[in-house]
Amino acid sequence: MPKMKTKSGAAKRFTVRAGGTVKRSQAFKRHILTKKTTKSKRQLRGSVNVHFSDVASVRAMMPYA
């Protein structure tokens, strides 16, 4: 059986942590930031976990992660 391929877009967006949770970055932080308040931009900093109902589909896109 051939090797399974990793979806490269998912590999760029997600990181699998040691406990099995998946880390992702926040959206709405790339451009058009002048109309967004300082508070909203500050709250979009950092990373968050992918919701547990979506973890299985993300892990399926990255079989070797």
From Swiss-Prot:
NCBIfam families in alphabetical order: rpmI_bact (TIGR00001)
GO BP: translation
InterPro entries xref list: Ribosomal_bL35, Ribosomal_bL35-like, Ribosomal_bL35_CS, Ribosomal_bL35_sf
A GO molecular function held by the record: structural constituent of ribosome
Gene Ontology CC terms: cytosolic large ribosomal subunit
Chain segments carrying region Disordered: 1-21
UniProt keyword Ribonucleoprotein, yes or no: yes
PANTHER family documented for this protein: 54S RIBOSOMAL PROTEIN BL35M, LARGE RIBOSOMAL SUBUNIT PROTEIN BL35M
Superkingdom of the source species: Bacteria
Entry's transmembrane regions: none
Protein name: Large ribosomal subunit protein bL35
Entry keywords, A to Z: Ribonucleoprotein, Ribosomal protein
Pfam families assigned to the protein according to its UniProt record, in alphabetical order: Ribosomal_L35p (PF01632)
Similarity comment: Belongs to the bacterial ribosomal protein bL35 family.
